[in-house]
Amino acid sequence: MAIDAFLGKWCLISSEGFDEYMKELGVGMAMRKMGSMAKPDVYIIKDGDTITVKTESTFKTSQFSFKLGEKFEENTLDGRKTQTLVSLKDDGSLIQEQEWDGKKTIITRKLVDGQLVVECDMNGIKCVRVYQKA
């Protein structure tokens, strides 16, 4: 499966374990409350071999751009500066690995029955967020 299958606008329809995952990341309580309440739209855009992921909510908008397989510095929504690598696996999943201060989290995006399923994992604390194509 090519990256093109991920392109478009995606709207959050369900979220499980997000508060616990944000806590494991080190996100403060006020920002966790806002993050848990937000129903973000995610835009995945491709321009040549550069891919941009833009997350928009009523609270905050952020975006990052990358080329598959090339490490880059990402400024996350919660204020972390990470070294990030995004790769497309043979099974069609998009794997985003963030490293900072000796810590690591892995965000896996995959398409399941036409929905974008985002699985986040840090130290075994997992969350699953499901998006419907707009």
Curated annotation (Swiss-Prot):
Source domain of life is Eukaryota
Catalytic activity line of the entry: hexadecanoate(out) = hexadecanoate(in); (9Z,12Z)-octadecadienoate(out) = (9Z,12Z)-octadecadienoate(in); (9Z)-octadecenoate(out) = (9Z)-octadecenoate(in)
Question: What does the record list as GO biological process?
Answer: lipid transport
Q: Which residues bind (9Z,12Z)-octadecadienoate?
A: R129, V130, Y131
Write down any Gene Ontology CC term. cytoplasm
Q: Which UniProt keywords apply?
A: Cytoplasm, Lipid transport, Lipid-binding, Nucleus, Secreted, Synapse, Transport
Compartment(s) where it occurs, according to its Swiss-Prot or TrEMBL record = Cytoplasm; Nucleus; Synapse; Postsynaptic density
Q: Where does N-eicosanoyl ethanolamine bind?
A: R109, Y131
Q: Record keywords: Secreted included?
A: yes
Query: How does the entry describe the domains?
Result: Forms a beta-barrel structure that accommodates the hydrophobic ligand in its interior.
- Similarity section: Belongs to the calycin superfamily. Fatty-acid binding protein (FABP) family.
**Protein's name in the database:** Fatty acid-binding protein 5
Its source organism is Pygoscelis papua (Gentoo penguin)
